């Protein structure tokens, strides 16, 4: 088996919103990489032994005092270095070039760069040709400052009308700087540039692929837990499902999954989880039907934050009770993924993987004394999904829209009651079914129904009814940080509304939420 960590790229984070995207792109190319804060030590870099280093972008100005710098060792390590945006500016400044503050002439958004010289980074890449025969590339810019003089030994590789050094290189040392963002899709050939860097310039092999990651994870799990028993909280979500499948492959019946049905799940979800993991895949699952316990604890509580805390607390109590019954369990498995690890590390702490444990399960009692197993902690969400497919999990489960941890507890506004949850489940199932039928489900990023605790007058036949209101919500987003409401066709919305009002006795009115984020959040609570 090839070592999936043998070749690797180190990405130093200077605070750009795009940094995780760079890491995901390098992984997509098939090369392992890690994301560390910019202030790492020489010893840490030596220990990691990267085949190449990428200096990412950042919001600071190189011209400001105390702005972040790459460790000097980066330029003496003998490996290729690629500086992106701020990374190019700090590389230039640190190696003897010059950076000036942009005054009113920064470049933000689409730009076309003109190639001035050949470079290994841009080999065979062009989007268009200018009238005087120069290669042109479509790129995405986001910078105020710019390099005004490049270091000795470097050549200008590309320019724009306002930026004389849109790209620079020192081919001898294999140092490259680009003022644009190759990692975003708006830079049309960005993936080819990053691929040139990782595979051709750094000489990495593309060993990082789902089948190899699975083999590696199973080997490591066997080594870590040996013949011990492991306990896992299985929610039916992507992360815990993939952890369950990996552990099942590695240790079989020594894994006990605890599935807690809190009464706040989607229609038939508990049944589907039990059928898939229990009957189909043959996992050892303890099914705890705790609907009444959760609803009793939530009685009379209308505050969203308090509801979240109650749901979390009751889950921990139940999980603790079940874990104590597994007297031989020595390990607790969790679905921690790489963005959780990065978040926990923060900047200015050195190496990004020296972290505080990220407890997805939340505040589990210390007296459990279980070791922690986190087989997904190196993976991004899109990688977890690809691994899930390779492990045989169904596509529609892995690529389902996000569902909040507290479930319908935060989609029923105000106090949560069984009657409200049952109505909401059925209304939501109709909305999702119709989205699939109309081939719209995968065109929106997230869609769901919200129960509003208000009554509205309706007419059914000759009679009047006074029943509840639900709101449909559908958004389009890239990163869930900002979102637009989805412009679903009116006839589609009309069809969904008619079905819900006619088929779900107790709902008399359906509205559509047209709020963006900001100012509204995606979920209502």
UniProtKB/Swiss-Prot annotation:
It comes from the Bacteria. The keyword Glycosyltransferase does not apply. Keywords: ATP-binding, Glutamine amidotransferase, GMP biosynthesis, Ligase, Nucleotide-binding, Purine biosynthesis. GO terms for biological process: GMP biosynthetic process. GO terms for cellular component: cytosol. The active site is at 85 (nucleophile), 181, 183. PROSITE patterns: GATASE_TYPE_1, GMPS_ATP_PPASE. InterPro entries: Class_I_gatase-like, GATASE, GMP_synth_C, GMP_synth_GATase, GMP_synthase, GMPS_ATP_PPase_dom, NAD/GMP_synthase, Rossmann-like_a/b/a_fold. Residues 8-207 form the Glutamine amidotransferase type-1 domain. ATP binds at residues 235-241. Pathway: Purine metabolism; GMP biosynthesis; GMP from XMP (L-Gln route): step 1/1. Residues 208-400 form the GMPS ATP-PPase domain. Disulfide bonds: none annotated. It catalyses: XMP + L-glutamine + ATP + H2O = GMP + L-glutamate + AMP + diphosphate + 2 H(+). GO terms for molecular function: ATP binding; GMP synthase activity. Its EC number is 6.3.5.2. The keyword GTP-binding does not apply. Catalyzes the synthesis of GMP from XMP. Homodimer. This is GMP synthase [glutamine-hydrolyzing]. It comes from Shewanella oneidensis (strain ATCC 700550 / JCM 31522 / CIP 106686 / LMG 19005 / NCIMB 14063 / MR-1). The lineage of its organism: Bacteria, Pseudomonadati, Pseudomonadota, Gammaproteobacteria, Alteromonadales. The gene is guaA.
């Amino acid at each position: 088996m090839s070592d999936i960590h043998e070749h690797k790229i180190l990405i130093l984070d200077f605070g750009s919103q795009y940094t995780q995207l760079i890491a995901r792109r390098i992984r997509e190319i098939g090369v392992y990489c890690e994301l560390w804060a910019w202030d790492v030590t020489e010893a840490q870099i030596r220990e990691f032994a990267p085949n190449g280093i990428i200096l990412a972008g950042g919001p600071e100005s190189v011209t400001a005092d105390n702005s972040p710098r790459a460790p000097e060792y980066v330029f003496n390590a003998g490996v290729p270095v690629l500086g992106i945006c701020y990374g190019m500016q700090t590389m230039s400044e640190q190696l003897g070039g010059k950076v000036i503050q942009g005054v009113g002439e920064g470049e933000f958004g689409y730009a076309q760069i003109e190639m001035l010289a050949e470079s290994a980074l841009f080999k065979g890449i062009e989007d268009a040709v200018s009238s005087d025969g120069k290669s042109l590339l479509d790129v995405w810019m986001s910078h105020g400052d710019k390099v005004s003089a490049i270091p000795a030994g470097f050549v200008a590789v590309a320019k724009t009308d306002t930026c004389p050094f849109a790209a620079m290189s020192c081919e001898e040392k294999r140092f490259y700087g680009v003022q644009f963002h190759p990692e975003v899709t708006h830079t049309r050939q960005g993936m080819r540039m990053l691929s040139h860097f990782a595979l051709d310039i750094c000489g990495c092999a593309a060993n990082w692929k789902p089948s190899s990651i699975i083999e590696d994870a199973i080997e490591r799990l066997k080594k870590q837990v040996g013949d011990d028993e492991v306990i896992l909280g299985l929610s039916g979500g992507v992360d815990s499902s993939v952890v369950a499948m990996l552990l099942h492959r590695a240790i079989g019946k020594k894994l006990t999954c605890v599935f807690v049905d809190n009464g706040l799940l989607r229609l038939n979800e508990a049944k589907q989880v039990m059928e898939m993991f229990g009957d189909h895949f043959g996992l050892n699952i303890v099914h705890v039907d705790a609907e009444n316990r959760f609803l009793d604890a939530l009685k009379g509580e209308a505050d969203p934050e308090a509801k979240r805390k109650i749901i979390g607390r009751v889950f921990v109590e139940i999980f603790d009770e079940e874990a104590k019954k597994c007297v031989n369990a020595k390990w607790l498995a969790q679905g921690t993924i790489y963005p959780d690890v990065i978040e926990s590390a923060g900047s200015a702490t050195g190496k990004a993987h020296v972290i505080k444990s990220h407890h997805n399960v939340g505040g589990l009692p210390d007296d459990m004394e279980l070791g922690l197993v986190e087989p997904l902690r190196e993976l991004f969400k899109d990688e977890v999904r690809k691994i899930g497919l390779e492990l045989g999990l169904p596509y529609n489960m892995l690529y389902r829209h996000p569902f909040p941890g507290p479930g319908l507890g935060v989609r029923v506004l105000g106090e949560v009651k069984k009657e409200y949850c049952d109505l909401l489940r059925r209304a939501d199932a109709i909305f999702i079914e119709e989205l699939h039928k109309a081939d719209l489900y995968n065109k929106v990023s997230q869609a769901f129904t919200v129960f509003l605790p208000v009554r509205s007058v309706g007419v059914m036949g000759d009679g009047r009814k006074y029943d509840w209101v639900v709101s449909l919500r559908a958004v389009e987003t890239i990163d869930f940080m900002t979102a637009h409401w989805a412009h679903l066709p009116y006839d589609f919305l009309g069809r969904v509304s008619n079905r819900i009002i006619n088929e779900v006795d107790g709902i008399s009115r359906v509205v559509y939420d047209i709020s963006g984020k900001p100012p509204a959040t995606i979920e209502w609570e």
